């Protein structure tokens, strides 16, 4: 059972106890990411995430790393378009210690100038590494094709130019503006008692920051076709279709539809593109949901001489799906697969912590396992096939990275 508590300052705490495990996962979730940036500070959310590990007033960067290594724990962080998360997984006996270290990073990071300089170079290398992975960067190009100059189209890593401008003052200002109590959720899952909520509150329940009023601009969904010429071994193709926002009433219809289309080895795309025609090693689809927008993405990578055939095969798969719909067998298989994935994820304290943290941060509510199963069971052929006809139109965005940069016809 999930326990929810809101501190006096607005910080929300969610805790789910599972006495059958010996681990505890703790996540500090903040409702800010690259979407909340301006062009001048694009990448600051991600860089701030890096700098949290570079030293506090009581610990050096090495001591932060050693803090978790010596207890056999794990600590990490990630930045997305709409949120940032710092998390740790430790044995239950070390839960309070892990909380203390995470809180120390949150409240007492020093942003030392020498560490800033070194970490900028680390992120420069991360950007270069990303540039050397066209199967990754093509997704950023698709975001640009879909959202244009809106901040949802910004790269999470930022650019070398914006990164160069960051300093301790700009990081502290960004924290002041966006790391405010109303944007913070602490999610805890594992073998932990409800009294741990009070331990979290001691750290996070009293700090104050007014922050910055941010009425987010709703993005328009563009259907640009962007190409980039790059010396690669393969052509990397992405198609983007307008999807559904977080919490949409038909989100489970879309989850099932995406799974049938390209979410598994038995999916239409995998079978048509890879198994039947041998055109690609990697082909898949996925859905991204944001506060007020969403996108269903199809990706395929193939030799440049097979790009046209790959594009045609994807279009044929979509046309067949729209015309004939999915079958009752595909529907039932997909629903059972989703249920199985959900049940297996519940065995992981990290997965529970992540699920609860995101639900609290983005939706402000939680569904029980039975409620989710009931919603999946309610998905039917009419709803899924109707959604397929609605989504898969000629109005889609496209991104391509290839040696020639030539668009498939």
UniProtKB/Swiss-Prot annotation:
Protein biosynthesis is among the record's keywords: no
Cofactor(s) listed: Zn(2+)
Cofactor remark: Binds 1 zinc ion per subunit.
Domain of life: Bacteria
Gene Ontology process terms (BP): proteolysis
Principal EC category: hydrolase
Database matches in Pfam families: Peptidase_M16, Peptidase_M16_C
Chain residues that bind Zn(2+): 46, 50, 126
Molecular function in Gene Ontology: metal ion binding; metalloendopeptidase activity
Keywords in alphabetical order: Hydrolase, Metal-binding, Metalloprotease, Protease, Zinc
EC number: 3.4.24.-
Positions of the catalytic residues: 49 (proton acceptor)
Cited PANTHER family: METALLOPROTEASE (PTHR11851), MITOCHONDRIAL-PROCESSING PEPTIDASE SUBUNIT ALPHA (PTHR11851:SF49)
Family: Belongs to the peptidase M16 family.
UniProt-recorded name of the protein: Uncharacterized zinc protease YmxG
Source organism (scientific name): Bacillus subtilis (strain 168)
Phylogenetic placement of the source organism: Bacteria, Bacillati, Bacillota, Bacilli, Bacillales
